[in-house]
Amino acid sequence: MDLFGDLPEPERSPRPAAGSGGPLLFDDLPPASSGDSGSLDTSLSEEVKNEGKGAKRKASDEEKNGSEELVEKKVCKASSVIFSLKGYVAERKGEREEMQDAHVILNDITAECQPPSALVTRVSYFAVFDGHGGIRASKFAAQNLHQNLIRKFPKGDGISVEKTVKRCLLDTFKHTDEEFLKQASSQKPAWKDGSTATCVLAVDNTLYIANLGDSRAILCRYNEESQKHAALSLSKEHNPTQYEERMRIQKAGGNVRDGRVLGVLEVSRSIGDGQYKRCGVTSVPDIRRCQLTPNDRFILLACDGLFKVFTPEEAVNFILSCLEDEKIQRREGKPTVDARYEAACNRLANKAVQRGSADNVTVMVVRIGL
């Protein structure tokens, strides 16, 4: 049985993009980012529990907590054209004493991952990390998460990439968290740092979005019918006030006060935060999958320092206005398109600080092109 064979085919647009050959907008995507895509939640453990002819796969406790959210009804065969991806970033310390955010841009790690050449043409990785209690957890995650991912990435022929990428991501997050907690607990006094993590792993034209905490990933997609760009949420925030998160925390013996774990921690999933792991805080990410289409313009990854003062729609429209600003021209030998994306990141980060965001601000924009 195909991993997603039980899912209905996506609806097709009556007016496909000329020469694209790729999948179009799937009908279960929200019209705009609502900030809570809970209605789209679908656990991969439910989808793969029957494998082969009636064989059952047992889901581990961690997999039950880490659900894969489908941003489309079925992963279609990718277009013969692989969309190019290129990341740009800007960061501001804001009013904080220390810059505790971290980020990683790896436009092409295909050679490092050594994927099955017959199945995968390109692998890319983009991530933002929002540290709290210090910079050590976010810095550690930025330095090690992708390295662990590369080591665990599916290799060799005769494997199903679709079936193994989620396990690869789950193992990567678990291993990275365990490594940091081991190092943190060996210190005197023990480190209490923690970090969110929002990662986009692109395997050809398929995005896998793994998220812990309240940093976010947003996709800008053009709607041909409305002739407008939509901001589509690719990640799910993890706050202790959410029902499932609160129930897990309480079941583990913790509690939620004033919207925080034990009245202190603002997020319910993170890397690090060793003192809260026994209280139900977990490093198991939510994993979503999204097929890129010819109508996709860019991906925005940002920490909550941006979204405290910008809605996703406002941020996407702000970036679009920068990309259409003809005053931004080629400079320092860089093409105009690069100059505009860099300006969009810098202007958006500056505007967030001007609007009063007291937090660190990290803005990453990933350009999607042919």
From Swiss-Prot:
Mn(2+) 1 binds at residues 130-131. InterPro entries: PP2C (IPR015655), PP2C_BS (IPR000222), PPM-type-like_dom_sf (IPR036457), PPM-type_phosphatase-like_dom (IPR001932). It catalyses: O-phospho-L-seryl-[protein] + H2O = L-seryl-[protein] + phosphate; O-phospho-L-threonyl-[protein] + H2O = L-threonyl-[protein] + phosphate. Its cofactor is Mg(2+); Mn(2+). GO terms for cellular component: cytoplasm. Transmembrane segments: none annotated. Residues 86-368 form the PPM-type phosphatase domain. One of its GO terms (molecular function) is protein serine/threonine phosphatase activity. GO terms for biological process: signal transduction. The modification N-acetylmethionine is found at residue 1. Residues 46-69 have a biased composition (Basic and acidic residues). The modification Phosphoserine is found at residue 13. The keyword DNA-binding does not apply. It is found in: Cytoplasm. Keywords: Acetylation, Cytoplasm, Hydrolase, Magnesium, Manganese, Metal-binding, Phosphoprotein, Protein phosphatase. Gene3D superfamilies: PPM-type phosphatase domain. The modification N6-acetyllysine is found at residue 188. Belongs to the PP2C family. Interacts with ILK. Protein phosphatase that may play a role in regulation of cell cycle progression via dephosphorylation of its substrates whose appropriate phosphorylation states might be crucial for cell proliferation. Selectively associates with integrin linked kinase (ILK), to modulate cell adhesion and growth factor signaling. Inhibits the ILK-GSK3B signaling axis and may play an important role in inhibiting oncogenic transformation. This is Integrin-linked kinase-associated serine/threonine phosphatase 2C. It comes from Bos taurus.
